[in-house]
Amino acid sequence: MNIEVSIDVEDEVRLALKDYVTVYCRPLPENFLTPCVLVEQMGGTSSNTIDNFVIRLGARAATDAEALQLLRVALGVLEAQTKAQFGKLRYSITNSLASWGSDPVRPDLKLCTATVLVTAHRETIAISES
């Protein structure tokens, strides 16, 4: 039987960004490189063959200015990639952009985050009865 399932949106966003910034999906590795962007899925909705995902991009760098610039680049790349219909991604809207100050994982780093709505097509997979 064929069924429709949601994509791994964190990995799709990582693939869209990886040629332009250092990017990770959750969980952040213990010895992560900086500056970097972490992609986290926070929620979403599904309607027919379309999924709308809420994701958070967290840019970590030595200074607030570097973190904000990295986040702006990541958001610009993601927007360009979704306009180009990269992979399974179809559309993205930045909902909020904020500076959080120090990174809770590594307090020596600064953290800037953005919440983004990403639209993607669901994928069809074949499953067998058990």
Segment roles from a protein language model:
Residues M1-L15, M42-I50, L89-S130:
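Short, charged interaction patches at domain edges and termini
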